A protein has these predicted regions:
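Class I SAM-dependent methyltransferase SAM-binding "motif I" and its flanking Rossmann-like core
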Residues: 106-157
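Residue-level preference for the first positions of well-ordered beta-strands
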Residues: 4-7, 97-101
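Glycine-rich, flexible N-terminal cofactor/catalytic loop recognition
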Residues: 1-66
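Glycine-rich, highly charged phosphate/nucleotide-binding loops
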Residues: 79-91
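Short glycine-rich anion-binding loops that position phosphate/pyrophosphate groups of nucleotides
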Residues: 12-15, 38-39, 71-73, 105-109
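Short, basic, glycine/proline-bearing loop/turn elements
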Residues: 1-10, 74-76, 151-155
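Charged helix-capping and loop-helix junction motifs
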Residues: 48-49, 82-85, 114-116, 120
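Glycine-rich phosphate/diphosphate-binding loops that line cofactor/substrate pockets in enzymes
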Residues: 1, 25-28, 88-98
């Protein structure tokens, strides 16, 4: 039986803003994946999303780590190639029956690199779940004591 890929939002940077659901999934998954500068585990441990999760869920450091090379570039060919490579790595691990928590800075529904890998994993017939988090624009408004929208006002994201 295949594992499940959980694309997990780690929020805007404060480990205390990691959701209870995200923490539970990180605890239950034997494998943690992160988008990194390279496939070296040391690069994966330097990712902000990994550091947030490790601060909130200390057992994160004892899990198998997949550092998925996701370069910050607009070079389409390079992006497509690295997305395919990441998807292959994920699918191979998921087909071993292991669940994976792919950590994402911010929220998985807003400019998340896991979107591309999740699509390929779904197309391979493997289950994917997206775990939402606290978006940075909401986290920024809270300490200011500001409402982002009231009454008949519109809020556009």
């Amino acid at each position: 039986m295949n594992g499940t890929l959980y694309c997990v939002s780690t929020g805007p940077g404060d480990p205390e803003l990691l959701t209870l659901k995200a923490a539970r999934i990180i605890r239950q998954c034997p494998v943690i994946a992160v988008s990194a500068r390279s496939t070296a585990a040391s690069d994966g441990r330097q990712c902000i999303a990994y550091k947030i999760a490790a601060a909130a869920v200390p057992e994160t450091g004892q899990k198998e780590l997949l550092a998925l090379h996701m370069p910050m570039t607009r070079e389409r060919e390079l992006l497509e190639r690295t997305h395919r490579e990441a998807a292959r790595t994920l699918i191979e691990t998921l087909r071993q029956g292991k669940d994976i928590a792919w950590l994402n800075l911010g929220d998985v529904s807003i400019y998340s690199s896991s979107t591309y890998g999740a699509k390929a994993v779904r197309e391979a017939g493997v289950a994917v779940e997206m775990v939402s988090g606290v978006p940075s624009f909401c986290a920024a408004a809270a300490p200011l004591g500001r409402s982002l929208a009231e009454g008949g006002e519109e809020l556009q994201v």
